[in-house]
């Protein structure tokens, strides 16, 4: 999965997919009542990027729905996975469940069109703080209460704070999650980070009894780092330059080992060599 980083304006969806992304990451900020408010990152952000592009959250969802609904004039067949980077740092811990409920209602209405031919992309809820695990239950309970448990098939999870793998496992246990787990590891492109924790996550994924299904590394803009991440066995690479990742995947060393995921590839299934 080539994951376009910080796609917060509707116009950027096309831009990143046209460069080769089959997945995008979108920032979601919350107001003081735990309502998802904007798709917005703000300053500081990655080097070389405009940090200030934004939409109202529900407007972005409608644009995203158009881009991921077959038959729509804006439809992009390649776009199959969306990671919502939930900026829950502005919330109190006791608001996490509420944030999940409100997020679910927004997605149900504006993205999934109340289950009536809505957007088809797989969705990952990416939460920075393991203490905010009640967000997951708030979200999943709401989908069930609203009569759409089938949409849980489209839903995956990520704790993005680079916490110890064991602590993340505990948070999932508390949240009642087993499966559909992406594990992120990374740092802003302005800084360097080694692959120690990525390798640990990959080992958990491949152990047969770990909690992780997929591993992605962020934010990768250089060919050398892309090669290192692929060599470590990641499933996804988040990038500001999808064309760089595409170029590396076309190199002889990687062409036979990797391909770009399509809608038919289940993002919740651990890949077996």
Curated annotation (Swiss-Prot):
Main location as per UniProt: secreted
What's the Enzyme Commission number for this chain? 4.6.1.-
* Family annotation (CDD domains): GDPD_like_SMaseD_PLD
Q: Which Pfam families match?
A: GDPD_2 (PF13653)
What is the UniProt remark on how the cofactor binds and its stoichiometry?
Answer: Binds 1 Mg(2+) ion per subunit.
Query: What residue intervals traverse the membrane?
Result: none
State where Mg(2+) binds: 25, 27, 85
User: What is the residue range of the signal peptide feature?
Assistant: none
Q: Name one GO biological process term.
A: lipid catabolic process
Which GO terms label this protein's molecular function in UniProt? lyase activity; metal ion binding; phosphoric diester hydrolase activity; toxin activity
Q: Where in the cell is it found?
A: Secreted
Q: Which UniProt keywords apply?
A: Cytolysis, Dermonecrotic toxin, Disulfide bond, Hemolysis, Lipid degradation, Lipid metabolism, Lyase, Magnesium, Metal-binding, Secreted, Toxin
Q: What does this protein do?
A: Dermonecrotic toxins cleave the phosphodiester linkage between the phosphate and headgroup of certain phospholipids (sphingolipid and lysolipid substrates), forming an alcohol (often choline) and a cyclic phosphate. This toxin acts on sphingomyelin (SM). It may also act on ceramide phosphoethanolamine (CPE), lysophosphatidylcholine (LPC) and lysophosphatidylethanolamine (LPE), but not on lysophosphatidylserine (LPS), and lysophosphatidylglycerol (LPG). It acts by transphosphatidylation, releasing exclusively cyclic phosphate products as second products.
What family does the entry list?
Belongs to the arthropod phospholipase D family. Class II subfamily.
**What is the protein named?**
Dermonecrotic toxin LhSicTox-alphaIA1ii
């Amino acid at each position: 999965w080539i994951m376009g980083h910080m796609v917060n304006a509707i116009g950027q969806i096309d831009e990143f997919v046209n460069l080769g992304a089959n997945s995008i990451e979108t920032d979601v900020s919350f107001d003081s009542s735990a309502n998802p408010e904007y798709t917005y990152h703000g300053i500081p952000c990655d080097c070389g990027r405009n940090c200030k592009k934004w939409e109202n959250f529900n407007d972005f969802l409608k644009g995203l729905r158009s881009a991921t609904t077959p038959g729509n004039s804006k439809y992009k067949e390649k776009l199959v996975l969306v990671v919502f980077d939930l900026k829950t740092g502005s919330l109190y811990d006791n608001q996490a469940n509420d944030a999940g409920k409100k997020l679910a209602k927004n997605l149900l209405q504006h993205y999934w069109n109340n289950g009536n031919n809505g957007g088809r992309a797989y969705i990952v809820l990416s939460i920075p703080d393991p203490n905010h695990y009640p967000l997951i239950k708030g979200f999943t309970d709401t989908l069930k209460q609203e009569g759409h448990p089938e949409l849980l098939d489209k839903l995956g999870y990520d704790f993005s704070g680079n916490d110890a793998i064991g602590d993340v496992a505990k948070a999932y246990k508390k949240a009642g999650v087993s499966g559909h787990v992406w594990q992120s590891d990374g740092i802003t492109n302005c800084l360097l980070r080694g692959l120690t924790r990525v390798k640990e996550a990959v080992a958990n994924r491949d152990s047969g009894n770990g909690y992780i299904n997929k591993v992605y590394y962020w934010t990768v803009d250089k060919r050398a780092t892309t090669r290192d991440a692929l060599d470590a066995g990641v499933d996804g690479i988040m990038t500001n330059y999808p064309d760089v990742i595409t170029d590396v995947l076309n190199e002889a060393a990687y062409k036979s080992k990797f391909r770009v995921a399509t809608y038919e590839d289940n993002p919740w299934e651990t890949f077996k060599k």
